[in-house]
């Protein structure tokens, strides 16, 4: 946590003061802290939202859903859902100076369950997202060799069906109906040692467990001192992946066949716009890549100074995120185009999404390049960094929420560090089940259900309804104006009121209608209890919102209408817009704490 305290100058402006010792409140709790500067906040948010989905999900969705035509539904969701909810969550954190749970308690107690729902998603996300880092670290360490281990069929884990690819004739070196490539055998038989189903978990993969332990150790020390350590680490973790991406992009576009790959990536097929699945993919991609409905943006925004221009930051970060996804598509599909030409097969046979791209398609392409170990190291180091800052910001979000809920317990010397250690240890131990021989099936359950687009859409519906219709869109706009000095684009307010809840509700209902049970590798079908477990993971977050509302209504005393009124009223200690305007002479904050009778029924 930052050790700054706020001082007030003669003209009323807030000015940071840097004491030598860590400042404490009157009750002995440590101060909450702020970012040292705007750049730390911007890089932290950039590190959170720019992650693996930008590299391995967006390019594939663009290719799959009509190439350049996919940008039409993508931009619709960007402006109607992505940017409005992104601003809503960031501004909410900055305005309340609270984490992902207590921020909602402050503005509308009856919807505090929104915070619990988002943190439940984050808890599950913290367990399984870092598994990808364990795999990437394993591949990274395996790349420090002259000959990449997935480049040939002469290893102990290879089977008699393994066949190396012959570039000269565009076919496998041999013929067999059961032929497999060395890349797939390395992934399934060396890395995963995958079993035949979720019912057979098998033994723990100790090498992957050590990689997971290393990932958690790195994650812990990135955030163990709060924003003081996080703000420094992101200077590297949020910027270095761009250097790696540029290097891979330059290498990719200079390869033969790159133009063919880029054409498949961008060539517009407008007829795909009539397929509702294309629109659903665009919507879920926005929610995944913008990290909304997770409480992370609220937590990061809560460490901003009150008058930080969060509106400008949000617009810039949203376009940076989308731009990164677009550019990453060139880097990925130029390589896939090269691989398609080398193998003499259609690009549809080499294009993959998710882990299939990172651990099968791209490693296969790297083998065909000169100095292949170098390019493998660059790629997997980029994957590690992309996942690392997304991971530790999610952990920071959970810790911030817990500390703000129980400040007298955790805002003491060294207790925050112990809390982070506890979260890391528990998440590490739970995550070990995904590193067993059947762990991949468990990982897929978490990925498909726990942090699915369905869960995020459900939370987004209530977020927009709560702020726009219960707290009041105009009131929240007044709060933002008080913070930044002017009112944001009016369309955003109407998105909160109408477009965002309508679009999210329609997409949520469509995802329910189009639901299909989970399969692995398009071959393995989960048993009924596997899908039931997945639905429990999904409902564990969604049920928090109605359950908390019913709990608070049931425990509060008084007439029903009075209980509703109390639970819909914001906290009295929230700062309100200065009636004289943001440029008016300084007014004591205490005179603005209470809402006027004209502004609220509370």
UniProtKB/Swiss-Prot annotation:
<dbReference type="GO" id="GO:0051936">
    <property type="term" value="P:gamma-aminobutyric acid reuptake"/>
</dbReference>
<keyword id="KW-0472">Membrane</keyword>
<dbReference type="GO" id="GO:0035725">
    <property type="term" value="P:sodium ion transmembrane transport"/>
</dbReference>
<protein>
    <recommendedName>
        <fullName>Sodium- and chloride-dependent GABA transporter 2</fullName>
    </recommendedName>
</protein>
<dbReference type="GO" id="GO:0005886">
    <property type="term" value="C:plasma membrane"/>
</dbReference>
<dbReference type="GO" id="GO:0070062">
    <property type="term" value="C:extracellular exosome"/>
</dbReference>
<feature type="disulfide bond">
    <location>
        <begin position="153"/>
        <end position="162"/>
    </location>
</feature>
<dbReference type="Pfam" id="PF00209">
    <property type="entry name" value="SNF"/>
</dbReference>
<dbReference type="GO" id="GO:0150104">
    <property type="term" value="P:transport across blood-brain barrier"/>
</dbReference>
<feature type="transmembrane region" description="Helical; Name=4">
    <location>
        <begin position="207"/>
        <end position="227"/>
    </location>
</feature>
<dbReference type="GO" id="GO:0015171">
    <property type="term" value="F:amino acid transmembrane transporter activity"/>
</dbReference>
<feature type="topological domain" description="Extracellular">
    <location>
        <begin position="142"/>
        <end position="206"/>
    </location>
</feature>
<feature type="transmembrane region" description="Helical; Name=6">
    <location>
        <begin position="282"/>
        <end position="302"/>
    </location>
</feature>
<dbReference type="GO" id="GO:0005308">
    <property type="term" value="F:creatine transmembrane transporter activity"/>
</dbReference>
<feature type="modified residue" description="Phosphoserine">
    <location>
        <position position="591"/>
    </location>
</feature>
<feature type="modified residue" description="Phosphothreonine">
    <location>
        <position position="587"/>
    </location>
</feature>
<comment type="similarity">
    <text>Belongs to the sodium:neurotransmitter symporter (SNF) (TC 2.A.22) family. SLC6A13 subfamily.</text>
</comment>
<keyword id="KW-0813">Transport</keyword>
<keyword id="KW-0325">Glycoprotein</keyword>
<feature type="glycosylation site" description="N-linked (GlcNAc...) asparagine">
    <location>
        <position position="269"/>
    </location>
</feature>
<dbReference type="GO" id="GO:0005369">
    <property type="term" value="F:taurine:sodium symporter activity"/>
</dbReference>
<feature type="region of interest" description="Disordered">
    <location>
        <begin position="1"/>
        <end position="22"/>
    </location>
</feature>
<dbReference type="GO" id="GO:0098793">
    <property type="term" value="C:presynapse"/>
</dbReference>
<keyword id="KW-0812">Transmembrane</keyword>
<feature type="transmembrane region" description="Helical; Name=12">
    <location>
        <begin position="528"/>
        <end position="548"/>
    </location>
</feature>
<feature type="transmembrane region" description="Helical; Name=10">
    <location>
        <begin position="453"/>
        <end position="473"/>
    </location>
</feature>
<dbReference type="GO" id="GO:0005283">
    <property type="term" value="F:amino acid:sodium symporter activity"/>
</dbReference>
<feature type="glycosylation site" description="N-linked (GlcNAc...) asparagine">
    <location>
        <position position="173"/>
    </location>
</feature>
<dbReference type="GO" id="GO:0008028">
    <property type="term" value="F:monocarboxylic acid transmembrane transporter activity"/>
</dbReference>
<dbReference type="InterPro" id="IPR002981">
    <property type="entry name" value="Na/ntran_symport_GABA_GAT2"/>
</dbReference>
<dbReference type="GO" id="GO:0015881">
    <property type="term" value="P:creatine transmembrane transport"/>
</dbReference>
<keyword id="KW-0769">Symport</keyword>
<dbReference type="GO" id="GO:0015734">
    <property type="term" value="P:taurine transmembrane transport"/>
</dbReference>
<dbReference type="GO" id="GO:0042995">
    <property type="term" value="C:cell projection"/>
</dbReference>
<feature type="topological domain" description="Cytoplasmic">
    <location>
        <begin position="1"/>
        <end position="40"/>
    </location>
</feature>
<feature type="transmembrane region" description="Helical; Name=8">
    <location>
        <begin position="366"/>
        <end position="386"/>
    </location>
</feature>
<dbReference type="InterPro" id="IPR037272">
    <property type="entry name" value="SNS_sf"/>
</dbReference>
<dbReference type="GO" id="GO:0016323">
    <property type="term" value="C:basolateral plasma membrane"/>
</dbReference>
<dbReference type="GO" id="GO:0005368">
    <property type="term" value="F:taurine transmembrane transporter activity"/>
</dbReference>
<keyword id="KW-0597">Phosphoprotein</keyword>
<feature type="transmembrane region" description="Helical; Name=1">
    <location>
        <begin position="41"/>
        <end position="61"/>
    </location>
</feature>
<feature type="transmembrane region" description="Helical; Name=9">
    <location>
        <begin position="418"/>
        <end position="438"/>
    </location>
</feature>
